[in-house]
Regions:
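Structural detector for internal amphipathic alpha-helices that build alpha-solenoid repeat scaffolds
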Residues: 282-292, 302-305, 312-324, 330-333, ...
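Low-complexity, intrinsically disordered segments with a bias for serine/threonine
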Residues: 7-10, 390, 626
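The −1 position to Zn-ligating cysteines in a subset of zinc-ribbon hairpins
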Residues: 370, 386
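Bacterial Sec signal peptide processing site at the extreme N-terminus
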Residues: 1-16, 20
Length: 645
């Protein structure tokens, strides 16, 4: 039979108009993309090693499921183990992120089921637990699907302040950072819209994507990243350059032209170069040039001389993903001075492998010293060493978010970089000591991986000192003492002691030597900070965030929000203010008549003209296709949920 389905995005009676429209059509006009949502996984697990705070679980489907699993694993006398006050049955939940690969870690949350006799998960260890999709089927109860992942590890709970009644709920739940391991690869699936569905069109779209994005296998053979599977579906693999910013990868793919010869492409690049000069159209023009590939690099470079930071930023970002470092200095400038662009600038810098870009990221690890001398021509700007007024008074502008963001970008780029290379502590977590200057900072993580970063490699605990690391380890020091005594007391075992210096890194190592876990170390550091034994501040998951205000002088129409890079995980449920980890003021600065970047439902930032009394209906037609298909859930990709999340 024959099909009358149209093979171009527009049906028109005039064949010339139809041909023209088809030539202008982009891949995004033909496709929708699935596989962006989270897969919710659940399981029933057993937490061991509790200090008498566990309990025998009540009869329930959860208990039956756990007993079957323990019997399958050959655990001797599982019922006696469940009755022990050192164990507790827990519900394990995780969210499998898009594009995860087999063996990749992800966060897991655990909680006690309603009615559990257990009172606290503090100090516990989650035994290996299978995680699968689960669904309630009428008449059959809860059924489990394929096993997608397994989870295990130390349980980290929130160490909030309050009495035992206030903390009761907090102690009944926790998370295992990086405790899940995926057993499957997740790829994206590109689906042709029904009206364009055909084998020929699927091959054409896959061919256009594959010519722009490809990789080399271990034999050095070039392979396209898009492969047609049926007359409607194309399997899409992420390009390594976009591994930590796949939302941008999808936006670029949508800008690829389906039919375009060399002459037409050259004309279009000239047009896009002009659009790149305007703040209203710079973002989309940069994406379109990036979609063309390396031939567009000269046009993007010309925009680096533009007077507007916004234009320079969009051009520099596109250049970075084209593996050109010409805009690296602009990205570093945006990361330090413009919080609305910071997350995107750091993600782009992390993709550049050249030495100058590495040095720029290293500089971002350090606070910025600005002139605070009234009347000096450099007042409010970085100190000029040759200026006598600058030397009179300096003000250190320090951002925990920027320092840790630069660290994460460097770690993603090269985790063996000698400036940030860490030390593996007892196969429990990684300890990094960084010479950064400024006020001392300790950064702790509750997401992705257990990690402690000391900004200031000679940080020492103040004495007198008396804190705990877990239930059995005490850390004490007398006033003015140069050493700290770490003691472990446990019923039925002889006491153990370690004497170390007051350096925080040495205290951490000594505590782990006596059996402290990562949650125990976090507890110790938080307690020491509350008692003012820590010389600086402690920040937890201080990653760059989206949804911030950016002011500019020119009018603009509404521009769709960018979905955030997945380089920096955050939480959908995190209601904390950015100010908690951001010491420097918003450098956006302009008058009330300027345009602002406002938060959107997708968690991104949109450029909005604050002077408009009401939105222009015409603006809706200019919204990019990606705005409606970044995430069907309407939230930031949920791996950005903090599994207190």
């Amino acid at each position: 039979g024959w099909s009358s389905r149209s093979q171009s995005p527009t049906v028109a009676s005039d064949s010339k108009n139809t041909t023209s429209t088809a030539a202008e059509a982009s891949v995004g006009d033909y496709i929708s993309i699935s596989g962006l949502g989270m897969i919710t996984l659940e399981g029933v697990g057993l937490v061991m090693g509790l200090d008498g705070t566990g309990g025998d679980p009540r009869p329930s489907p959860f208990r039956m499921s756990l007993l079957k699993d323990m019997q399958r694993r050959g655990v001797p006398d599982p019922k006696a183990l469940l009755r022990s006050p050192k164990t507790a049955l827990v519900i394990v939940r995780a969210y499998l992120p898009p594009l995860i690969r087999k063996g990749d870690p992800f966060d897991v949350e655990v909680r006690l089921p309603p009615g559990s006799e257990a009172t606290s998960l503090n100090g516990g260890w989650l035994m290996e637990t299978d995680l699968a999709e689960r669904a309630v089927v009428p008449g059959e109860g809860v059924l489990a699907g394929h096993i997608f992942a397994r989870a295990k590890g130390h349980v980290l709970i929130s160490h909030g302040e309050g009495d035992s009644e206030d903390l009761a709920g907090v102690l009944r739940r926790g998370r295992v950072p990086g405790g899940g391991l995926s057993r499957k690869d997740r790829d994206l699936v590109v689906a042709l819209k029904n009206r364009y569905r055909s084998v020929r069109m699927a091959r054409r779209i896959a061919d256009r994507i594959g010519k722009r994005f490809y990789a080399y296998n271990r034999h050095g053979v070039r392979e396209p990243l898009a492969n047609p599977k049926t007359d409607r579906t194309i399997v899409l693999k992420i390009h390594p350059k976009y591994r930590d910013n796949f939302p941008r990868f999808l936006r670029v793919i949508r800008q690829i032209k389906v039919r375009e010869d060399d002459v037409t492409r050259q004309v279009r690049m000239q047009q896009l170069s002009g659009q790149l000069e305007s703040v209203q159209t710079a973002r989309k023009a940069a994406l379109s040039l990036e979609a063309i590939g390396t031939k567009a690099i000269p046009f993007l470079k010309t925009a680096l001389e533009h007077s507007e930071l916004e234009v320079r930023f969009h051009a520099a970002t596109a250049l970075a993903y084209l593996d050109d470092n010409s805009g690296a200095a602009t990205l570093a400038e945006a990361a330090r001075h413009q919080r609305a662009f910071r997350v995107y600038a750091l993600a782009a810098l992390s993709t550049l492998e050249d030495a100058p870009s590495q040095l720029l990221l290293r500089e971002l690890l350090k606070p910025l010293e600005v002139c605070n001398t009234e009347g000096c021509q450099h007042h409010g700007n970085p100190i000029e060493v040759s200026c006598p007024h600058c030397r009179e008074a300096g003000l250190v502008k320090q951002s925990a978010e920027l320092q840790y963001g630069a660290f994460r970008a460097l770690w993603t780029r090269d985790r063996l970089d000698p400036v940030i290379r860490g030390e593996r502590i007892g196969d429990l977590f990684t300890l990094h000591e960084i010479e950064a200057g400024g006020r001392p900072l300790i950064h702790l993580t509750q997401l992705q991986r257990p990690e402690i970063v000391l900004f200031g490699n000679d940080q020492e605990l103040r004495t007198p000192l008396a804190v705990q690391a877990g239930n059995h380890i005490w850390i004490n020091a007398q006033p003015g003492a140069p050493t700290v005594t770490i003691s472990r007391y446990q019923v039925g075992r002889p006491p153990r002691r370690e004497v170390v210096s007051t350096r925080i890194a040495d205290v951490i190592r000594g505590s782990v030597k006596l059996g402290a876990s990562y949650p125990d170390i976090v507890q110790m550091l938080v307690q020491a900070q509350r008692q003012q034994n820590v010389p600086g501040q402690i920040a937890i998951d201080a990653v760059p965030r989206t949804g911030r205000l950016y002011f500019r002088e020119a009018n603009s129409t509404t521009s769709p929000a960018d979905a955030p890079p997945n380089l920096f995980p955050t939480s959908v449920q995190d209601a904390k203010s950015d100010a908690s980890s951001e010491d420097e003021p918003d450098q956006a600065g302009a008058g009330q008549d300027d345009d602002a970047v406002s938060a959107t439902g997708a968690g991104g930032a949109s450029l909005v003209d604050r002077r408009l009394a009401k939105p222009d209906p015409a603006d809706t037609s200019s919204t990019d296709p990606q705005a409606s298909s970044q995430d069907s859930s309407g939230s930031r990709f949920s791996f950005l949920e903090k599994l207190f999340r």
